[in-house]
Amino acid sequence: MTCFAARYPLVAMFALVAAASLGSAQPASGPVTAFKFQFGAEKAAAGYTLVSPALKYSKETGYGFESGTTPTTVRSDTGDALHRGAVTDAQPFLFSVAVPEGNYRVTVTLGDPTEEAMTTVKAETRRLMLERIRTAAGKFVSRTFTVNVRGPKISTGGEVN
């Protein structure tokens, strides 16, 4: 599952969670697998995995920012531990999580601790999940959506590009 964010003029993705949940991602069906990622903070809140903008996707971790996309960190000393950091960039950036095929309930928390933000989220770099979600400086909103993940292999042979 790949999450794509574009900034117009400012995008911040904060506490992206994935549990077969991305921010938090959970499968909408099947065995529950949960990932809770916190972006941009100095220290992760309890139960979250800290993700720095420098963390590149690897098969070993199963998650990270895709090559060629390096957001920057925004931090604030105000607010609770979960809302003290964010990642942002003037260009789109991609964060991927390796998950098996299935339907996933994904919750993202969007906002920026210091500036107004406008965020667009796409799944697998193409499917629009959230468009131009605007948040005021220091304000955060959570949104939940379902992502259907399918591999390129077809069970009867062949492959989808």
Segments (PLM) and residue ranges:
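Bacterial N-terminal signal peptides that target proteins for export
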Residues: 1-12
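Compositionally biased, intrinsically disordered or flexible polar/acidic segments
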Residues: 14, 22-161
